[in-house]
């Protein structure tokens, strides 16, 4: 075990500021319309004693949405105003057949079009690397047109506050991160493996490398076969309480064919149903067990809450059903003030789902240990790409806690391993498998909290319902077995701007 508080405080990239957080990333545009408002609060990496105020850490990881796709129009973030005044830059994506030769981001207007849900588009390892194009970020439209056909254009679609009122209200009330990345330039499974173990076994030493998602999910032939260490095992060995709350249909060993976002199913040490490790990984359901534990004051130190298919936001599942699910998690935490006062909830997305984001992620240099595939030959589905593994594209991250109240924007660079490092910093349980490079370029999420500013006021949040008549009419109940009509690219999308207003940011330490 590590001394609690030492690793994260030393490894944090910066306080939540708009300048330091971009060090080492793609060059900023010559000019930017993103305004930074006056500083009204100061925070640095908290001490171990301060962080001890957090007794419950809750991770909610939804599916397949990029930062620009959800929050590109949100005020003050690095979003759609992040381009030179005299051009559209990377926002104008080359595409054959377009009148101007390029396509701009366009609004998926849920009020007037059938945009409440759109079909799934490719987000596998090879197409994502082609969209990245060595950091040029100019392959989004061409790659998706080639792979996804009539559905490909939706890569450039985005939602606004009118479409996502609950999520925008959470950002207004708490803290949003605009430099949080998924871990892998690829799909669900490798990213979720990083979120629980900080690796996808690129050297193939323990069952990997895992670079794509295997259907059905998790694949029956790969269930309980992976041999590397996960964080829950470390927590178990250290005596730190933890649980996974999953879809009740998957909270048994039987696991009829279907889907779960709980990737602990892949790891061999969880196979024995008589062990506490297995029970904590697969024995608890959402919402019933989660509600019971919160209301009884027995919520463990670390929790993972996984949504079931249809409400996890994986296209064609609707964002609105995801909002309803997340609102249930938040409302449950708020229902017990004693638990809420000691809780930090982190809401993010496993990967971008093929949706456009304009910020080129920082990636490891060639030859970086643990950050490229070293098996030979490469997996057949690698498309010839051995590297980079990551960082991946930006995805949303909302930090919901009485210590994150106030509508802050945090621009420190994070990825999914930052969630593990938050646990490491708070509880002294070392993250397994984390590369030295990734530890050096990402923070541990402690700077998203101001532990000197406990705010127990309950924010006013809109009602989020999974019974919205538009969603019921347009969207399938199960995202995997159904599709929806193609969403066409509008004929003349115009470059948009962000919401008016400035960002509140914590000052640099």
Model-derived features with residue positions:
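N-terminal export signals
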Residues: 1-17
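N-terminal pro-sequences and low-complexity stem/linker regions of secreted or lumenal proteins
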Residues: 19-509
